[in-house]
A protein has these predicted regions:
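Membrane-spanning helices that line or support transport/gating and their immediate boundary helices
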Residues: 1, 69-77, 107, 111-114
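Short, small-residue-biased leader/transition segments that mark boundaries at the very start
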Residues: 3-7
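Alpha-helical transmembrane segments and their short interhelical loops
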Residues: 13-88, 136-161
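Mobile beta-alpha loop/short-helix "lid" or hinge segments that flank ligand
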Residues: 31, 35, 91-100
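Transmembrane helix-loop junction
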Residues: 39-40, 44, 76, 100, ...
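Short cytosolic juxtamembrane segments of multi-pass membrane proteins
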Residues: 162-170
Length: 170
């Protein structure tokens, strides 16, 4: 048995997907690190301790993993990069603008309030904002957000796995 035997082994498809998703998560953490340094230069004073940092990192990991799975699954059904970029913009921009990322939604009423509250990113943004800006967290809300994103991550991973199997078994 030599090194050549190692290279001849078949890689599990779930490992391929997991590697792709974890790469996206690592890139996300690098981006978050850079943005954190930049925010400190603008005199942002986060309420960070070990617990809030750990809880925030869990939320960032789950969010990045979920979105990476969705993006990977979408990339497997589209014919080229131009279509991928167009579709991702059509998904990401409404999700971003229909969340509480840019404006407060406390007094909002009606259909728009319903849409914003149905957006999972509204909840994860609120949880991260509460952790970093105020150093507090509502445990029930935090567990809801973690459960929601574990579910979304599981579904997106499963869908990406399904799409990869379908793509490779043509």
């Amino acid at each position: 048995r030599g090194l050549g035997d190692v290279y001849k082994r078949q890689i599990k498809r779930s490992s391929i997907i997991l590697g792709q998703l974890l790469e996206a998560v690592i890139c996300t953490f690098l981006e978050v690190g850079i943005m954190s340094i930049v925010s400190l230069l603008f005199s942002v004073k986060p309420q960070i301790n070990l617990i809030t940092l750990l809880l925030t990192l869990i939320l960032v990991f789950l969010t990045a993993f979920s979105m990476a799975g969705l993006a990977y699954g979408i990339s497997l059904i589209l014919p080229n990069e131009v279509m991928y970029e167009t579709v991702m913009n059509a998904i990401v921009l409404p999700i971003f603008f229909l969340s509480n990322a840019l404006f407060p939604v406390d007094g909002m009423k009606g259909f728009l309030a319903f849409i914003i509250n149905a957006n999972p990113f509204t909840h994860v943004i609120s949880a991260i904002r509460s952790l970093l800006l105020y150093g507090t967290i509502d445990i029930a809300n935090y567990l809801f957000v973690v459960s929601l994103f574990v579910l979304i991550a599981s579904i997106s991973f499963g869908w990406a796995f399904y799409r990869l199997n379908k793509e490779m078994n043509l």
